[in-house]
Amino acid sequence: MKLRANRVGEQMKKELGDIISRKIKDPRVGFVTVTDVQVSGDLQIATVYISVLGDEEQKESTLKGLAKAKGFIRSEIGQRIRLRKTPEISFEFDESIGYGHRIDTLLHEINKEGKREE
């Protein structure tokens, strides 16, 4: 069953990227990248992880815009993916990109310090 949830998640990720970039006209929704979709084993709940280009204020307004368009997004997903019941969608920020950037910065600083000591 987990395999099916993963396949549905990947398909939803692809469709959500298209829906958010092309169909949503809300000016609050900025440049959004869908980084991952986690679907529960019973296919009832989908957590969508997004990355937003901009500062904290833009991120919050994008999240509000997506929350407002949640019903439209869910109906579009229901039309594009044939499931008995379309999963309930929730949006969350993907912090892994910022975390990866922080690790990259720290490694770069360590590398600089190593060169200075030589």
Curated annotation (Swiss-Prot):
It is found in: Cytoplasm. Keywords: Cytoplasm, Ribosome biogenesis. Gene3D superfamilies: 3.30.300.20. GO terms for molecular function: ribosomal small subunit binding. Its main location: cytoplasm. PROSITE patterns: RBFA (PS01319). One of its GO terms (biological process) is maturation of SSU-rRNA. The keyword Zinc does not apply. GO terms for cellular component: cytosol. It holds the Pfam family RBFA. One of several proteins that assist in the late maturation steps of the functional core of the 30S ribosomal subunit. Associates with free 30S ribosomal subunits (but not with 30S subunits that are part of 70S ribosomes or polysomes). Required for efficient processing of 16S rRNA. May interact with the 5'-terminal helix region of 16S rRNA. Monomer. Binds 30S ribosomal subunits, but not 50S ribosomal subunits or 70S ribosomes. PANTHER family: RIBOSOME-BINDING FACTOR A, CHLOROPLASTIC-RELATED (PTHR33515:SF1). Belongs to the RbfA family. This is Ribosome-binding factor A. It comes from Bacillus cereus (strain Q1).
